[in-house]
């Protein structure tokens, strides 16, 4: 059952000891650490290579992702994969996930409109992201947007200030850039934001070319 609002929500009790991605994907469906699981179809875990060259972290699943159970399959996802292709990146070398695993939204008639996760919701869900990163040690990360950057780095981040300066996180390098939804919201700046996202993805991919010793996770 959901935690009382007087107690800080924490997904840690729901995360299994295993770092096998299949085990984590199954376990996340039982998570009720925060109220975001209410009125959603399912939790949406990461998808992609278990031994990637690069990890992409977004904010949260959207309406389409919640219904299909896969990350980045809605309008913003289409933009992301177009940018990945434009950057010359082999999609088979990627693992894509989100900082928050349930779709936060408000109902407007028959529509479900995205709502930005609050800081305590990002923190509550962080053990799930941590478990994914532990399954893929040393792999560089692209944080797509402010929510992803906050979850990965553990602090608020200005995208405009940090996107040209890769940050070290242990043995990883973190590249901060725009979320693909920013392209959809940019109106007359859409081409500029898209070009910046493509350039940042290409730079992250180029910096992650050397083969890494990566374990896929185990018991």
PLM-predicted stretches and their roles:
Residues 2-219:
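A polyanion-binding, active-site-adjacent surface
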